Amino acid sequence: MVALEVALRNNPTKGHIAKSLKELNYDFVFIDTPPSLNSLTLDALISSDGTLIPLQCEYYSLEGITSLVNTINELTNSGLTNNKIFGIIRTMVDKRNNLTKDVSDDLEKYFPKLLFNTLIPRNVKLAEAPSFGLAGTNYMPESCGAKAY
């Protein structure tokens, strides 16, 4: 908690996202942040009403999800945000390997109320899309990955 307080106190961008969002007239705004708790991510979490967490079915992701959930809960409990975790969605799923099943089992054990049933498969077309400057759903809308989203 102390590290979180120091990071927030020293955050030069704190509040910029919330101010920018107030000027928009949308029902939903999605903020895609990096998978790290840097100052931009913290500002996005504070500015958000809710969080949808995409999670790769890998063990490092399991370690990160616990930290992220704890951070969101600390921010909410300290009164800095009303952010609610909407859920966790598994991405880059490869049903051919045991790791996906093992990670899914752990997610079901530790986060049963947050876990969506939807599985986004590992798909090369989704991975190629950014190299063409497009979202995966626009690059190849008929691919299995795009359809899953």
Walk through the language-model features, giving the residues of each.
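P-loop/Walker-type NTP enzyme "switch/lid" segment
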Residues: 1-27, 129-132
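Acidic, proline/glycine-rich intrinsically disordered inter-domain spacer in sigma factors
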Residues: 2-9, 98, 137-141
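Flexible, glycine- and charge-enriched loops at secondary-structure boundaries
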Residues: 10-14, 58-61, 142
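Hydrophobic side chains within well-formed alpha-helices
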Residues: 13, 17, 103, 115-116, ...
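Charged catalytic carboxylate motif
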Residues: 16, 67, 148
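Conserved catalytic-core segment of NTP-binding enzymes
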Residues: 22-24, 28-124
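C-terminal boundary of histidine-terminating zinc-finger modules
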Residues: 128-148
